[in-house]
Amino acid sequence: MKTPIDQLLAEHRIIEKALRALAGLCERLERGEQVDPDAFDRIFEFLMTFADRRHHQKEEKCLFPALGAQGVPRDRGPIGVILQEHCTGRALIAQMRRAVSAHANDQFIEAARAYVDLLSEHIQKEDNVLFRVAQTLLDERSMRSLQDDFNQAEAELPGSLAKYEQEAQEMERAWAV
């Protein structure tokens, strides 16, 4: 039976596809290729909707409180680090958007590369540290409650997991180098 942690791990694999697509956009710009402006809108929408509003919000509003109930502090340790990285990621997306609006390819590439690096390392921390802590601390009852919280959070958001997975695959096929 899949646990809520398994769901978060699966979402990471989807986000990694989008990160490869974003890195591919950077490589194309570095080679002097033209990139369709819609590509930027599409990747930003995916990162803001799926990675941040769907995935990060399930962590921040569901998983972290469940871990807090088990004594894991929110403001320091692994959760504190993860929260700071979520904020940094949001700031980098804003930077990328400003760079695209200003037609500043170098600034976009710098922010996008920083975002890819940040999220790649961030995912490794969650997969190998935070989620293992969760699997150790959360009993079956807590996992069921967490699953209920995830279901409620997802019901409030647009789109299905399958839709986002397809979107990430399409972007990766189109732009990853």
Language-model segments: what does each one mean?
Residues 1-177:
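Small-residue-biased structural context
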